[in-house]
């Protein structure tokens, strides 16, 4: 059985004060190759991760693979939701960790816990995650904010990164682990994040809001009109 790497016996949970988010190759061209989940869901979750990082003051580093070519540009929501994000241009390296400037940007944060998502999962997410583990980092891979061309490719990649010591997570778990409590001033902003991770959550918010409105305004039920 594989165990999470570089935690030295500690619980494999995200330390917000030690975390940096790496959003790799979430590009409009590559998104067109995704087959393991609906593309709009992938796009929304990648954008949600950027917003999570902003709410939690987590550094964000982005990069793209030849964005001037068929892979296309980064989706704009990422930098819109994380205006503090640092973009690192690569010189053609497929594995972002093979780019010295990218690794230097990670090291410059002084943080050792990486939250990684990338498209395609089996390459853009997996390669740097495995490399970072080998360099001593704690790595959390956000699988449902990383897309690839088939469900089989996703499952194979998940097995591979777990064997390497990477901790797999989903976007909702990342949000909840970082948020920690609803007893905070920005709770409404966190609630909005969940509506992008799973849109049905918006229905819960609307139902709750209406129930409060009925009580507050002593609204007469339709059956009593």
Model-flagged regions — what are they?
Residues 106-112:
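Glycine-rich phosphate-binding loop signature in dinucleotide/nucleotide-binding domains
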Residues 74, 101, 127-131:
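A short acidic, amphipathic alpha-helical/loop segment
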Residues 92-104:
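Short phosphate-binding loop-to-helix
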Residues 80, 104, 130, 134:
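Short, well-ordered alpha-helices that flank and scaffold nucleotide-derived cofactor binding pockets
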Residues 2-92, 108, 138, 155-162, ...:
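Active-site acidic carboxylates
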Residues 113-171:
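A contiguous pocket-lining binding segment that forms or flanks enzyme active sites
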């Amino acid at each position: 059985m594989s165990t999470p790497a570089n935690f030295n016996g500690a619980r494999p949970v995200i330390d917000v004060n030690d975390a940096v988010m790496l959003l790799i190759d979430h590009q409009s061209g590559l998104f067109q190759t995704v087959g393991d989940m609906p593309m709009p869901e992938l796009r929304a979750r990648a954008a949600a991760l950027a917003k999570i990082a902003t709410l939690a003051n987590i550094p964000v580093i982005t990069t793209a693979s030849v964005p001037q070519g068929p892979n296309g540009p980064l989706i704009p929501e990422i930098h819109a939701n994380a205006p503090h994000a640092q973009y690192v241009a690569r010189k053609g390296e497929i594995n972002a960790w093979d780019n010295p400037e990218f690794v230097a940007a990670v090291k410059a944060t002084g943080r050792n816990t990486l939250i990684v998502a990338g498209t395609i999962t089996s390459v853009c997410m997996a390669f740097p995650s495995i490399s970072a583990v080998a360099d001593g980092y704690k790595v959390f891979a956000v699988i449902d904010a990383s897309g690839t061309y088939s469900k089989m490719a996703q499952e194979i990649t998940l097995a591979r990164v777990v064997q390497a010591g990477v901790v797999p997570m989903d976007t909702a778990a990342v949000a909840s682990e970082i948020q920690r409590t609803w007893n905070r001033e920005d709770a409404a902003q966190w609630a909005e994040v969940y509506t992008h991770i799973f849109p049905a959550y918006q229905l819960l918010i609307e139902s709750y809001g209406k129930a409060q409105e009925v009580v507050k305004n002593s609204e007469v039920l339709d059956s009593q009109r």
